[in-house]
Swiss-Prot record:
CDD domains: ASKHA_NBD_HSP70_DnaK-like
InterPro entries documented for this protein: ATPase_NBD (IPR043129), Chaperone_DnaK (IPR012725), Heat_shock_70_CS (IPR018181), HSP70_C_sf (IPR029048), HSP70_peptide-bd_sf (IPR029047), Hsp_70_fam (IPR013126)
Region (Disordered): 598-638
Organism: Buchnera aphidicola subsp. Baizongia pistaciae (strain Bp)
Primary role: Acts as a chaperone.
Record's protein name: Chaperone protein DnaK
Superkingdom to which the source organism belongs: Bacteria
Length: 638
C-alpha cells in the first residue's frame, strides 16, 4: 500500500511528513528546507513560483504574489475579516459570482482552493522525490475552529492538487499525536496552544496509555479563525508606516513596492526580537518625492513590539478559559502545555501562557513541525503502518435546526466526539402542510437569529394531516473530517431529502466569540426566552385544539357559552403576541377552565367516538416530538 502523507497546510508556512518505520520524518523540499513558505507568485513569463522562490521575488512583484490565502478559504467577500484584509493585502481580492472571496491575478479569477492546491502540489512532489513513487493520498490539517465550508474547501484544494484527502484533522490534535507518540508516557491531560500565521486554536486532550495502546481523546476545543502572526506583523507595519509618515511626511501605504519591502522587514524584525532586545528596520531608498529619495531607519525594541501586540495575545486567553470549562477541568488538571505555531516563539506569548496555566510550556516539541508529524501519524494509522493508536476528535460548535418560535433546537452539542450521528422527530406547524423547510444552524444561543445559518433545504410531498401529526425525522451526521450531512425523512411516506452543508462563508472571529461568550454572559436571558417560547407554543397549541373542538361542538353549545369561550380565546391570542409570560400562562388557564367546563357540560350529547377524537389528549402531539416552525412551500405560478 502506498504512503499516506501528512501535510500541515499553514497560513505562513507549510510542512510535509511521512511515516518512516515507526517514526515520522519531516521531509526537506527542493530548496533544502523543512518548511515551505505558503507563498505563490505568478510571473510575467506565466510561470508559477511556490515557496522560497516566490518569496524572493515578492518585492518586485507585489500584486501577483499571494500569501496568507488560508485566511480567505471558505469565506464570503463581505466577511469583516476579508474586508480588513482587502485594505492591507497588495493583491486584489474580488467577489465571485457566488459571493465568495476570490483573487484577481492578471485579469484571471482564482478561487482560494485553486491557489492552495499549488502549495499542496509542491508538498506532494517533495514526497514523491524522496520516496521515488507516486503519491495519491494525504491527511491534511486544518484549524480546530474551521467550519464546514472551510474544511470542504481544504478538501477541494487537495483534490485539485491530485490528492485523495483521506482525512481532515485538527491542527492541535495532530500536534498532540506527535507529542504523545514521541514524548508522552502514561496517562496525561495536555493543553495544545496553537498560534500560527493566521489562526489560533486551543484544545484540551486526554491521552490514555494502556498496555502500549494509546487513545487520544479531545475533551474540548476553542479558538479564533482570524488571529495569528499576520496580525502581529500588521501591527508592526502600521507602527513603522506611522512613524515614517510623522518623520518624513510621506504615507507609504500608497506605494505597494515600499509596503512589500516593509512587510518583509517587519516580519524579520519580529522574529529577531524573540532573541534580542532591539533591532533596526533599515530600508534605504524606500520611496522618493520631489525632494529626492527617502530612507527608513527605525529602531524597534522588544518592549515596543510587545506594547503593539499585547491585546492580540490577551485575545487568546479567553478561549483557554472556555475550553477548560467545557472540558470540566481546572488548571491543576493539565499535566503538560504544548506550544504549536511559529508565533509561539515570541517570549511574551510563552510568558502569558505560562502565567495562565501556572506551568512552563514544554520546549521539546518543534512548533513548526509538530502538526505535520501528527498528520503523518494519522496517515500511518489509516494505512495500517501505525498500530495501537485511536484518535477521538470533536466538533467545535453545536449544530441544530430552527423550530417553532424562532428557537434553535440542538441535535449535536459542541465538543461531541466525531464521527457522530443523531436523529430527532419533528412535526408540522400547520394543518395539511405538504412541505417543510429545514433551516440548519451552528452556535450556542437559544434564538435562531443569534446563531450562524449554515443553509436550508425543503422536504415536500408530505402526506396532508392535522398539525402535529406528521412525523419528520431529521438526522445530523458529522463525518471524520468534521463535515456535516443533513437528511429529513417523512416517516409516513418515506420521502427523504439529503444535503451536505457547504456554507460559502466562514465563521468570523466576531461571530464565533459572540456565539460562545454571549451564551455564557446571556444564559439568564436565554433561559427566559426559552421559557417564554415554551409557554407560547403551549398556548398556541391549546388555542388551536380548543377552536377545533368548538367547531365540532358548535351545534350543541349555546350562544352564551360560545361567547364566553371565544372571549377567552381572543384574550389568549392577544397575550401570545406579547412578551409577558405570566399573562400568557393566566390566559391559558382561563381557556382550559372554560373549555373543560363546556366539554363536561356537553358530554352526554356526544358519541364515544367523537368524544375520543375531540378529547384534549388526542390533539396533543406525541411525546418527544418538537413543534417545528416549518412553512409550506407553495408553487409560485405566474
Amino acid at each position: 500500500m502506498s504512503k499516506i502523507i501528512g501535510i500541515d497546510l499553514g497560513t505562513t508556512n507549510s510542512c510535509i511528513a511521512i511515516m518512516d518505520g515507526n517514526k515520522a520524518r519531516v521531509l526537506e523540499n527542493s530548496e533544502g528546507d523543512r518548511t515551505t513558505p505558503s507563498i505563490i507568485a505568478y510571473t510575467n513569463d506565466n510561470e508559477i513560483l511556490i515557496g522560497k522562490p516566490a518569496k524572493r521575488q515578492s518585492i518586485t512583484n507585489p500584486k501577483n504574489t499571494l500569501f496568507a490565502i488560508k485566511r480567505l478559504i471558505g469565506r464570503k467577500f463581505t466577511d469583516n475579516e476579508v474586508q480588513r484584509d482587502i485594505k492591507i493585502m497588495p493583491y486584489k481580492i474580488i467577489q465571485s459570482e457566488n459571493g465568495d472571496a476570490w483573487i484577481n491575478i492578471k485579469n484571471k479569477k482564482l478561487a482560494p482552493p485553486q491557489i492552495s492546491a499549488e502549495i499542496l502540489k509542491k508538498m506532494k512532489k517533495t514526497a514523491e522525490d524522496y520516496l521515488g513513487e507516486s503519491i495519491q493520498e494525504a491527511v491534511i490539517t486544518v484549524p480546530a475552529y474551521f467550519n464546514d465550508a472551510q474544511r470542504q474547501a481544504t478538501k477541494d484544494a487537495g483534490r485539485i492538487a491530485g490528492l485523495k484527502v483521506k482525512r481532515i484533522i485538527n491542527e492541535p490534535t495532530a500536534a498532540a499525536l506527535a507529542y504523545g507518540l514521541d514524548k508522552g508516557k502514561g496517562n496525561k491531560t495536555i493543553a495544545v496552544y496553537d498560534l500560527g500565521g493566521g489562526t489560533f486554536d486551543i484544545s484540551i486532550i486526554e491521552i490514555d496509555d494502556v498496555d502500549k495502546e494509546k487513545t487520544f481523546e479531545v475533551l474540548a476545543t476553542n479558538g479564533d479563525t482570524h488571529l495569528g502572526g499576520e496580525d502581529f506583523d500588521n501591527r508592526l507595519i502600521n507602527y513603522l508606516v506611522e512613524d515614517f509618515k510623522k518623520d518624513q511626511g510621506t504615507d507609504l501605504r500608497n506605494d505597494s513596492l515600499a509596503m512589500q519591502r516593509l512587510k518583509e522587514s517587519a516580519e524579520k524584525a519580529k522574529i529577531e526580537l524573540s532573541s534580542t532586545q532591539q533591532t533596526d528596520v533599515n530600508l534605504p531608498y524606500i520611496t522618493a518625492d520631489s525632494t529626492g529619495p527617502k530612507h527608513l531607519n527605525i529602531k524597534v525594541t522588544r518592549s515596543k513590539l510587545e506594547s503593539l501586540v499585547e491585546d492580540l495575545i490577551t485575545r487568546s486567553i479567553e478561549p483557554l478559559k472556555i475550553a477548560l470549562k467545557d472540558a470540566k477541568l481546572s488548571i491543576s488538571d493539565i499535566d503538560d502545555v504544548i506550544l504549536v505555531g511559529g508565533q509561539t516563539r515570541m517570549p511574551m506569548v510563552q510568558k502569558k501562557v505560562a502565567e495562565f496555566f501556572k506551568k512552563e510550556p514544554r520546549k521539546d516539541v518543534n512548533p513548526d513541525e509538530a502538526v505535520a508529524v501528527g498528520a503523518a501519524v494519522q496517515g500511518g494509522v489509516l494505512s495500517g503502518e501505525v498500530k495501537d493508536v485511536l484518535l477521538l476528535d470533536v466538533t467545535p460548535l453545536s449544530l441544530g435546526i430552527e423550530t417553532m418560535g424562532g428557537v434553535m433546537t440542538t441535535l449535536i452539542s459542541k465538543n461531541t466526539t466525531i464521527p457522530t450521528k443523531h436523529s430527532q422527530i419533528f412535526s408540522t406547524a400547520e394543518d395539511n402542510q405538504t412541505a417543510v423547510t429545514i433551516h440548519v444552524l451552528q452556535g450556542e444561543r437559544k434564538r435562531s437569529i443569534d446563531n450562524k445559518s449554515l443553509g436550508q433545504f425543503n422536504l415536500d410531498g408530505i402526506q396532508p394531516a392535522p398539525r402535529g401529526m406528521a412525523q419528520i425525522e431529521v438526522t445530523f451526521d458529522i463525518d471524520s473530517d468534521g463535515i456535516l450531512h443533513v437528511s429529513a425523512k417523512d416517516k409516513n411516506t418515506g420521502k427523504e431529502q439529503k444535503i451536505t452543508i457547504k456554507a460559502s462563508s466562514g465563521l468570523n472571529e466576531t461571530e464565533i466569540k459572540k456565539m460562545i461568550l454571549d451564551a455564557e454572559q446571556n444564559s439568564e436571558s436565554d433561559q427566559k426566552f426559552e421559557e417564554l417560547v415554551k409557554v407560547r407554543n403551549q398556548g398556541d397549541q391549546i388555542s388551536h385544539s380548543t377552536k377545533k373542538q368548538l367547531k365540532d361542538l358548535e351545534k350543541t353549545i349555546n350562544v352564551n357559552d360560545q361567547k364566553e369561550i371565544n372571549e377567552a380565546l381572543n384574550k389568549l391570542d392577544t397575550a401570545l403576541k406579547g412578551e409577558n409570560k405570566t399573562k400568557i400562562e393566566e390566559k391559558i388557564q382561563e381557556v382550559l377552565k372554560i373549555s373543560t367546563k363546556l366539554i363536561e357540560k356537553n358530554k352526554p350529547k356526544q358519541t364515544s367516538e367523537s368524544s375520543n377524537s375531540n378529547s384534549p389528549s388526542s390533539s396533543k402531539p406525541e411525546e418527544n416530538v418538537v413543534d417545528a416552525e416549518f412553512e409550506e412551500v407553495k408553487d409560485q405560478k405566474k
